A protein has these predicted regions:
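Extracellular/periplasmic catalytic domains that process cell-envelope and extracellular macromolecules
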Residues: 84-88, 140, 180-181, 193, ...
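N-terminal secretory signal peptides
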Residues: 1-12, 16-23, 27
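N-terminal, post-signal-peptide metal-ligating segments of extracellular/periplasmic oxidoreductases
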Residues: 18, 22-157, 165-167, 177, ...
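Short aromatic-acidic-glycine turn motif
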Residues: 167-171, 313-324
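Extracellular/periplasmic metallocenter environments
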Residues: 146-157, 164-230, 333-378
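Surface-exposed interaction/gating patches
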Residues: 253, 257-263, 271-315
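Extracytoplasmic/periplasmic copper-protein system
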Residues: 42-70, 81-84, 212-257, 338, ...
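Surface-exposed intrinsically disordered loops and tails
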Residues: 120-125, 232-239, 343
Length: 378
């Protein structure tokens, strides 16, 4: 990168095209504005900052990105399930690559990304699409997992899973296989435990750079109902994708993330699933008579915490998703440090249809992209 050039500052992000936060009431108007002039996060010369509350106008080219905000919510990558000697086995192929991601209209971020041939984006394209966040890998407690990793990028990378596994499978420098050099491959193998809402990310050095560039994704381990009894077994069935009780729940994944577009160690863009204001331009439709289950993960670099606040409603929260009973009941805001995660459950039963806002309750984060809407429908 040319050291004489800087990326996009807060001021420039807002210059790409903006309206005041008061304009949130006119959501429909945001969907019909002219696209912004393309801006590279590595070659636009800027300086200064502006904390003015604003949001972008225009549209991100999701087709160019190869993935869509609404698709990221619902795409669970189950890999290739099988059986060996009577035991359930599940395998994935994960590839790390370098690519640009459009994170706001006309604003491109030079990312390092994970892709999988069994993600919705890759299946649709007929080739592996690298995405941020990476594919949501989903399995069942007790399964034997094999993750075949290929580093097709230009820097050493790893896969580090949050869960229980041996030191040899930890995916950290200097232990086991350690960092995987460009062109290298390695298979991570371990048992899926404990059940819960987990994550994976690159653990190569420098760690903050590899995470900030986009090498992370959700890792969900469904509980095995056969290991539970009574009411807990029924709850486990509703959290396990193989059971009909799970089909009655609307499940979503949001990874809270952010982007330092001028590489000064501070974020200029914040988002839910990478695209600034992605769920303002396309609100998330939810049926008011259906239980909503949100797998929420914070992978924001450079800021100590991120948060979720839902307007006009309250939710139950399961920290790390490793319990079948809520760890917090009837709250409307929760905060997470980096890599903290949990399950948010709520319903709009009895509510009138309409747009219900949700966002980070750090006001700056909301003003710079981490703002969204649920659209409650009958």
């Amino acid at each position: 990168m040319n050291n004489q050039k800087k990326g996009v500052s807060r001021r420039d992000f807002l210059k790409i095209g903006s309206v005041g936060v008061a304009g949130l009431a006119g959501v429909a108007g945001l969907r019909a504005v002219a696209p912004a002039t393309p801006t590279s996060a590595e070659n636009r010369q800027t300086h200064g900052g502006d904390e003015h509350a604003a949001m972008t106008v225009g549209q991100v080219d999701h087709e160019r990105n190869g993935f869509y905000p609404l698709e990221l919510l619902y795409d669970f990558d189950y890999g290739t399930p099988g059986e060996e000697a009577g035991r359930a086995v599940r395998e994935w192929n994960i590839v790390a690559t370098d690519r640009e991601i459009e994170i706001a209209p006309g604003l491109f971020f030079p990312g390092w990304v994970y892709g999988s041939p069994t993600s919705a984006a890759s299946l649709r394209a007929g080739r592996i699409i690298g995405q941020v966040p990476g594919p949501t890998l989903r399995c069942v407690e007790g399964e034997r997992l094999r993750v075949h990793f290929t580093n097709a990028g230009t820097h050493p990378h790893t896969l580090h899973f949050h869960g229980i596994h041996s030191a040899q499978m930890d995916g950290v420098p200097g232990v086991g296989r350690g960092m995987i050099d460009p062109g290298g491959t390695f298979t991570y193998e371990f048992e899926a435990r404990p059940f819960g809402c987990h994550l994976y990310h690159c653990h190569a050095i420098p760690l903050k750079r590899h995470i900030h560039k986009g090498l992370y994704g959700a890792f969900i381990v469904d509980p095995d109902p056969e290991r539970q009894e009574g009411a807990a077994q029924e709850t486990a069935r509703s959290r396990n994708h193989r059971y009909p009780e799970n089909e009655a729940v609307n499940e979503m994944v949001i990874v809270m993330n952010a982007f330092d577009t001028n590489f000064d160690g501070e974020n200029e863009v914040y988002a839910a699933n990478t695209i600034a204001f992605g769920y303002v331009n396309e609100p998330i439709q939810v049926r008011r008579d259906q239980l909503q289950r949100l797998y929420l993960i914070n992978m924001t670099e450079f800021d100590p915490i991120n948060s979720l606040h839902i307007h006009g409603n309250f939710f139950d929260y399961y920290d790390h998703g490793t319990t079948l009973e809520p760890t917090l009941r009837t709250v409307d805001t929760v905060m997470q440090c980096q890599a903290q995660r949990g399950i948010v459950e709520f319903s709009f039963g009895g509510f009138e249809p309409g747009l219900y806002m949700f966002h980070a309750h750090q006001s700056e984060f909301a003003e710079l992209g981490w703002m969204s809407f649920f659209e409650v429908i009958d």
